Each structure stands twice: as structure tokens, then as C-alpha cells.
Swiss-Prot record:
Its EC number is 2.8.1.6. The gene is bioB. This is Biotin synthase. Pathway: Cofactor biosynthesis; biotin biosynthesis; biotin from 7,8-diaminononanoate: step 2/2. Catalyzes the conversion of dethiobiotin (DTB) to biotin by the insertion of a sulfur atom into dethiobiotin via a radical-based mechanism. It catalyses: (4R,5S)-dethiobiotin + (sulfur carrier)-SH + 2 reduced [2Fe-2S]-[ferredoxin] + 2 S-adenosyl-L-methionine = (sulfur carrier)-H + biotin + 2 5'-deoxyadenosine + 2 L-methionine + 2 oxidized [2Fe-2S]-[ferredoxin]. Pfam families: BATS, Radical_SAM. [4Fe-4S] cluster binds at C61, C65, C68. Homodimer.
Amino acid sequence: MNLAKRILQGEQLTKETVLKIYEDTNIDTLDLLNEAYILRKHYFGKKVKLNMILNAKSGICPENCGYCGQSRDIKQKQRYALIPEEQIIDGAKVAHDNHIGTYCIVMSGRGPSDKEVDHISNTVRTIKSQHPQLKICACLGLTNDEQAKKLKSAGVDRYNHNINTSENYHDNVVTTHSYKDRTDTIELMKANNISPCSGVICGMGESNQDIVDMAFALKEMDADSIPINFLHPIKGTKFGSMDDLTPMKCLRIVALFRLINPTKEIRIAGGREVNLRSLQPLALKAANSIFVGDYLITGGQPNQLDYDMINDLGFEIDYDTCENKENKNEVSRAN
């Protein structure tokens, strides 16, 4: 194949070429993953970036996203308003103590009120005064220009707003907002010099063409960070009984995203534990970033298992991206 070599020499793969490769059953997934690893190693070495999520506001949402346990259609769910500043600040200390590079503050809902943006902004200022090198990612929904400027001024480094799926498949996933609403939000953040983070959820019934289209859309968007989520079906949601993924399919998807976005941070995110299962470590041959700890309303695995996974691969935590560089040997024993 020599895909990695061709890409490093400047070749731009087309959608048609990538789809053909992705669907070719004669191309072994592990061979494809090895091509992705050549690119991952070239641009990121063996380092793994760590991220942590805080669910700062839960279950209060008017949207009908078919994958989400916080959507308006779910009656039994965890509901609480935006938590106090002190709790968010405490979460930042946990992130610092666990060698996390990026701390992600997430809110449910269509978008934040001005009061909520002020609350988050004040909190971020305090966090930055205590942990100046800890990167802050906000995920608050649809925002306006004034709100984006406030977040930037407060010290927010990155803003996450996932496209989730392809433009073609979008209305099968949610109808209360448009695909353009999502892409416009990312463009707004870029206009305000906030690093754009946008990713996908795979396993919602999308086609192979949709998967390829998602990866190219994020390339065209120039997202700095790309989280790849794998559907963790939640009872009562539209996709609650969906079972469309295997560990090998997940690996093939991650490899494809690396081939199309060779220089970007690619993160294996929600659903990795239940979908990749014993093959989680192999995903880091293509991805260079993970979430540590729990997700929004589903649990992750114990932190130490993630540290061990990184060590066992011969990889290492990317200490260049985290503030806490002390006691490295407690979490990283790689040579």
C-alpha cells in the first residue's frame, strides 16, 4: 500500500480512494493500522495526551439527539443545573493531580445563557490562576460572538462542538438543530482564536460513505483535535438497541481518520471501553490522545488501567502538554 509514505510525500488522498481502501476486504485492518501508525509516530512519536471531562450541567436539554441520554426524550436521567464554581475548580485540581493536559468543562443544553457564560468565565479565570498551564476546553453548545469573546478573554483554550455524523446523515440523528448550526459554531470559535475541537460518534447506522465524509469534513474544517466516539447505546434513546460496531471495525475507523488527518490530535473517546474492548491499546497506534476517567453519563475505566495500557505499549504520557510533571514514575514506567 505504502499509504503513509505517499501521504508524507504530500499526496492528498481523495474520498473515492479512501472509500475504496476502507471497503476493500483484501486490505487487512492491522495492515491499515500500521500505515496509520507510521503517520502517528512521525508527527507525535509515542506520546499520548490525556484529557478529562467534567459534566458541569446535566440533563436539562431541549434537543432530541438520538444517541444522548440527556435528550428531551429521556424521562429517567440525571438532572442538575450548572454546578458551583468551587466544584469545577476542584475538578481542575483532580485533572492536575492526574497529569491531565486538557480539562473539558461540558454543559447540557442547546447553548448557554449569558449568565452561564459569565459563570464559566469567572471559574476559568480562577483555574488559570491556580494551574496556568492546564488547558481548558469548553463544550457549552451553540454560542454567539459576544459569548465566544468572553470565553477567550477568560482563558478558554479550546472549544468542542462535534459534528457527530455526516451532513448527509445528520437529520437521522437529530432534527432540533442543523448540521450548519454545528459547523458555524466551530467557525465562530476559530474566528475568535479559540482552538477548534470537533469529532464524531460512530455506530449510529451511518454508511461507509458517511464515515469517509465525516473524516474529510473535519479535515476541511481544520479541527485541531478530533475525538472519535463509539456509540454506547443508552436504553430509551433512538439508538438504544443499535449494535453496529466490532472492535476491528472501530480500529479501521480510527486508522482511516489518521490517514485523512495525519497531523491532528485524534482522541479515542466515549464508548472505547465497550466497543474496542481488549483491542483498546491497538487504537493508540493511530490515535494519540484519550479521555481518562468517566464520560458525561457513562463510566470509563479506572485511571490506572489507562496508565498501564500506555506503559504496556511502550508509549508515554505527553508531559509536554500537562502542568504536573512531578512523580512521573507513579503513572509512567515506559523506557
